[in-house]
Amino acid sequence: MTMKELFAPSDMTVGKPWEKIVAFTIPMLIGNIAQQLYNTVDSIVIGKYVGDNALAAVGSASPILNLLLVLFVGISVGAGVMVSQYFGARQRKELSMTIGNCVTLTAISSIIIMILGAVLSRPLLEMLKTPDSIIDWCTSYLVILMVGCAGSAYYNILCGILRGLGDSISALIYLLVATVINIVLDIVFVSQFHMGVAGVAYATVIAQAISAVLCMWRLMRMIFDFRPKYLKMKKQYSMEIIRLGLPSGITQAIFSMAMVIVQSLTNSFGEMVIAANVIIMRVDGFAMMPNFSFGTAMTTYAGQNVGARRMDRVEQGAKQGTLIAVGTSTTITLLIVIFGHHLMGIFTNTTELVTLSANMMKILAVGYIAMAITQSLSGVMRGAGDTMTPMWISMVVTVVIRVPLAYGLAFLTRTPELPNGRYQVLWISMLVSWCMGALLTLIFYKKGNWKKKALTGSSSEK
């Protein structure tokens, strides 16, 4: 294979479905793992060089960070679905208009998020009853990342466009470059310049900005130019991006709000449980990467084949891709159960914290198999243009199941010795919600209403 062939967009409407899905997933999985290294390296450097309280500060800020970035999630998903379907349908003009409108929408959204982040970070942390011992660190970390959010926004959205075109290799390479920069800057800013959590935040902002520039350069060489006619907002494209992306943005917002609410419960258990939750979520980020990668691959695969009117091929790929994802997550579950203690020891030298984290991680382990089903089949539905069904499923499992279950179990397990209840309920509620999400996703996939949502042919600009 020549370099030109390696970096060419992948046509997923031909060839064996499982081979196309796996070939697309592998570089994306490596890229997602590298992206998770951003947060993991932050945690390791903070935990080793600053201390457990600083580690807890970064963890307490994360749910709010995710909540404020949901606009970008929506734009990314909406653009990715449109790009994959227009690419599959060979509609070049519509493809360029979609990308241009996406670039402009991202610029507007970045300005909004910068302002909201700078103004709301401290009040939100206070509302969540963040301990006084870590609130200043939390605020510093959040404000820096919010003010510098444009790089992160453009990187994630432009990567989504590249993947919609079938190019997961470029996204991988640019992310690896940024990850190396992030790791180096983390170590320099924290261990050499003693900048604490602020140093970690600055390192992340710089690295993601470099990634965004590289992605933009790739798109310019590949398919897109910056002539004003493409960057000018056009209602039919911008509204379609919002229509398709809004449900995913709402889904992420609901999940992030739930995380914020559950973080308030987590904070009530003290710094040790907060720090344990940070470590668990870092390991969880890696464990979930194959599921997210398969889900994104299935979105691109389904989008291109729906655009090409190959629904039989969509269903064939959905079955094969989901089975591979389930097998991968089963392996991960076994590794967590066997080696969980060693994994937690990477993040901290505190024996009690390692033991606590490892025991709680075992509660979650089997849930990754359920999430393999949810992510793969939700990806198929999104790729076909049905972004509403995954949103409603997420709302039910998060708002109706996870949050009430966490608080309800905490209340029911209160004793004079444990006035806030048992901390284990934090992860038990998550496991139950994951399993219910898989069941609901499977039911709605089988119903098949998602097959009627194709975009191509309805929004062409002749």
How does the language model describe each region?
Residues I33, L37-A56, L125-D132, V188-M195, ...:
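Helix-terminus/linker motif at the lipid-water interface of multi-pass membrane proteins
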Residues L55-I115, S152-A171, Q263, A276-G340, ...:
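Small-residue-rich hydrophobic transmembrane alpha-helices
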Residues L67-V70, N182-D186, S211-M216, F286-M289, ...:
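Hydrophobic transmembrane alpha-helices of multi-pass small-molecule transporters
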Residues S76, I144-R163, A171-T179, V200-C215, ...:
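Short runs within selected transmembrane alpha-helices of multi-pass transporters and secretion channels
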Residues I46-N66, D132-W137, V197-A198, E240-L244, ...:
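Interfacial/gating helices of multi-pass transporter permease domains
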Residues M1-T25, V83-G148, Q192-L246, A302-G367, ...:
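Short alpha-helical transmembrane segments in multi-pass integral membrane proteins
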Residues A23-D42, I144, A178, A207-S211, ...:
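Transmembrane helical elements of multi-pass membrane transporters/channels
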